[in-house]
Amino acid sequence: MKVKEIPGSVYHTLKLKSLKGKDLQTLRADHLPVIISLTSIPSRLHKVHITIRSILYQSKQAKKVILWLNENDKNHIPKSLKILCGETFEIRYTPLTSSHKKLIHTLELYPDDIIVTCDDDFIYNYYWLEKIYKQHLQHPKAIIGNFTRQIQYDADGNLLQYKKWTHQQPDNKKTILAIGAEGILYPPKSLSPIATDINLALELAPKADDLWFKAMALLQGTEVFQATDKPKGLIPIFGTQKVSLKKENIDKNKNLTQWKALADHFKLDLK
């Protein structure tokens, strides 16, 4: 988290905390036919309610918000999170510990629904869900990402390091990778049926759920689009950035090795 982001983070955190839990629990009649699915880790349990509040306090509500936690966290749920549970928001538990749990179980439970995933350490803009849903209406069969990269190879066909995967939009939609932090919308049946094979996911991409789901989109023949009208940038929640899969994957070049494993196993062709 950058120093200049701290004042904004504190301001929006206090604003969200001032909202009454019972007001956020009620599902409005004009809600969108969307399920928001995310996960969290033990070190963020006392902060994730801020993210949930920002998701519940949207210009257009989702019909359901599911937070997936490991079953060992069941007896450690803070009151700040419990008071938000209601008609819209619920907490579910899983034996999984990997980040894949943000989507895999929701795909199993709601295969015919639009699912939007997000991260647990950010405050989301008031128009975040409404905007990504409008993008979905323009491309109803495509996966929509608010933030994307281009999987890139050099002239000899060698995969470039993740840091060199640019944000430029290529003509070849196959190379577009949606990044989870800012939000990804998955229409029904946009991923291969084997997307929920957690054992295979953990074998090939144990620390890169975005790469796993990208491979599943390719197998299904689903295009990925960069949102052209996305809300203002994410606001990091103060005190949540100490543990990050993103940093580990980039610093140790794990994204590269995991994508190679996926591409080799599934014979993925991005040309």
Question: What role is predicted for each listed range?
Answer:
Residues 63-64, 114, 223:
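Residues at the starts of beta-strands that form the adenosine-phosphate
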Residues 51-63, 83:
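Short, acidic, metal-binding catalytic loop of nucleotide-sugar glycosyltransferases
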Residues 1-19, 29-31, 47-50, 200-271:
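C-terminal catalytic/acceptor-binding lobe
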Residues 112-123:
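Short beta-strand-to-loop acidic/aromatic patch adjacent to the donor-nucleotide binding site
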Residues 68-113:
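Active-site-proximal specificity loops/subdomain of glycosyltransferases
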Residues 35-43, 58:
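A conserved hydrophobic helix/loop-capping motif in glycosyltransferases and polysaccharide synthases
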Residues 33-37, 64, 212:
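Cell-envelope/extracellular polymer assembly enzymes that use nucleotide-activated donors
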Residues 123-198:
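Conserved catalytic core of nucleotide-sugar-dependent glycosyltransferases
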